[in-house]
């Protein structure tokens, strides 16, 4: 595995315009200098991702956020409540925002991750890091350094920060309009958001990670209230079936992508 020996090495690579896999509490990201158009294009090329789709910029907690996006009262309240953490805010773009990052949209997605390695990297780098999930386009998001290696081999240097504690992508809230709107659910639920900003509105804003072919495992996932009955029925139909053991919701989220990757490797048809 092409591991970065330390954070300083990862910083040097980012300063050179290279792409580095970085850990966050949600999933591993494919990181590049958010102020370097060439680095952003390298991210798109490495992922095989369609151009013109926005990517999230990750910032240090101490960073000058308002250079990247325009914060209204709702945005500031949500940032105070949930940053650092698994929340991405969609805001009117600021002066530092490149078209390559925003997909030429008038908005930008910003997040302040809570992962200590990610925060240390961002502080030492001293700028924003654009980082969609560190997988090939349409594949399952990685939650460990090994998952990233499965996707890219030695092609991408990896800053190993251990397994992602949350394991699913960040909640995305659009705060670029009068009423905030939930664009992508995540570990921070709608009720928690509304406790801060009141009832949510509706938005047609394009969110990072919202293309229809995102996060598409080969194994189908079945949510079931009668898992044993469904297993018997599906096996009678000739399907290869596996079951994810009962566990608290937070553990389900943390283990889901790893389980789907394993099922893809084993050739399982359906995971219950």
Question: Which residues make up each language-model segment?
Answer:
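Active-site-adjacent structural elements in enzyme catalytic cores
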Residues: 1-272
């Amino acid at each position: 595995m092409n591991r970065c020996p330390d954070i300083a090495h990862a910083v040097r690579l980012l300063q050179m315009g290279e792409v580095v896999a970085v850990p966050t509490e949600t999933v591993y990201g494919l990181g590049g200098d958010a102020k370097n158009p060439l680095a952003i294009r390298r991210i798109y090329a490495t992922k095989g991702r369609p151009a013109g789709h926005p990517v999230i910029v990750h910032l240090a907690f101490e960073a000058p956020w308002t250079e990247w996006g325009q914060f209204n009262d709702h945005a500031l309240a949500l940032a105070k409540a949930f940053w650092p953490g698994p929340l991405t805010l969609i805001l009117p773009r600021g002066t530092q925002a490149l078209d390559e990052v925003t997909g030429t949209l008038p908005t930008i997605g910003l997040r302040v991750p809570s992962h200590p390695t990610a925060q240390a990297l961002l502080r030492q780098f001293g700028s924003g890091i654009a980082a969609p999930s560190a997988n090939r386009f349409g594949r399952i998001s990685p939650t460990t350094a090994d998952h990233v290696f499965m996707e890219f081999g030695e092609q991408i240097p990896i800053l190993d920060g251990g397994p992602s504690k949350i394991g699913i992508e960040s909640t995305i809230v659009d705060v670029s309009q009068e009423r905030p709107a939930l664009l992508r659910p995540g570990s921070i639920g709608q009720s928690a958001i509304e406790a801060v900003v009141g009832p949510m509105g509706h938005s047609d804003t394009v969110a990072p990670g919202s293309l229809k072919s995102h996060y598409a495992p080969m194994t189908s996932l079945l949510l079931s209230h009668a898992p044993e009955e469904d297993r018997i029925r599906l096996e009678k139909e000739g399907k290869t079936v596996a079951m994810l053991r009962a566990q608290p919701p937070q553990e389900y989220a943390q283990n889901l992508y790893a389980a789907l990757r394993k099922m893809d490797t084993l050739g399982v048809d359906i995971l219950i």
